[in-house]
A protein has these predicted regions:
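Acidic/negatively charged segments and metal-coordination signatures
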Residues: 1-45
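Acidic/histidine-enriched ion/cofactor-binding microenvironments in catalytic or ligand-binding pockets
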Residues: 47, 112-145
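Extended boundary segments
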Residues: 68-101
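Short, basic/aromatic beta-hairpin or loop at an interaction surface
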Residues: 102-115
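Short, compositionally biased
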Residues: 147-161
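Conserved small/polar residues in nucleotide/adenosyl-binding loops
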Residues: 162-168
Length: 170
């Protein structure tokens, strides 16, 4: 059975407006695009104000965890130690580290040091040293809502990288 929203029903987006005054014209255009073979996003990708508020709660944990990392990161720290910090702080704030065991990923955070572009796996043997740059990518599940953010850190004194030849992407 197909459920169709009525023109005078509340809009599916949660705005409180009638469907005909909110998303009806948009949905009609999307249906035409779908019939022409274009990929069209589902309504569940568009979040209600209540869902956005819950996502923001998850984001607050990410920010707190990254702030903790910023306070403690220094030369001599292993990326495995960063993983422990992230795991413990995320759980302490009531969250779940989203990367842990996702499609076999073995850690609670991604740590990408220097030339590693993204999704580096923390390791006890990877010790941060003066001049390294590291991206710490934190993803949190809180009350069923996901958030993802990262921060780049310069370890020790900032170093000029102008002497390096960086790859060019065409």
């Amino acid at each position: 059975m197909s459920l169709k929203i009525g023109r005078n029903d509340p809009c599916w987006c949660g705005s409180g407006k009638k469907y005909k005054k909110c998303h009806e014209a948009f949905d009609e255009k999307m249906e035409i695009m779908k019939q022409k073979g274009y990929a069209v996003i589902d309504h569940d990708l568009i979040k209600t104000p209540e869902q956005i508020a819950k996502i923001k709660e998850s984001c607050k944990i990410n920010i707190a965890v990254l702030d903790y990392v910023e306070e403690h990161i220094k030369p001599g720290v292993s990326t495995e130690e960063i993983d422990r910090w992230v795991h413990e702080e995320t759980v302490r704030h009531g969250g779940i580290p989203a990367p842990l065991n996702y499609e076999g990923f073995p850690k609670s955070v991604c740590t990408s040091v220097n030339e590693v572009v993204c999704h580096g796996i923390p390791d006890e043997e990877q010790i941060l040293k003066e001049g390294d740059i590291i991206n710490v990518d934190v993803s949190t599940i809180y009350n069923g809502y996901y958030s993802d953010s990262s921060r780049m850190f310069c370890i020790g004194k900032a170093v000029s990288y102008t002497h390096l030849t960086l790859p060019t992407i065409a």
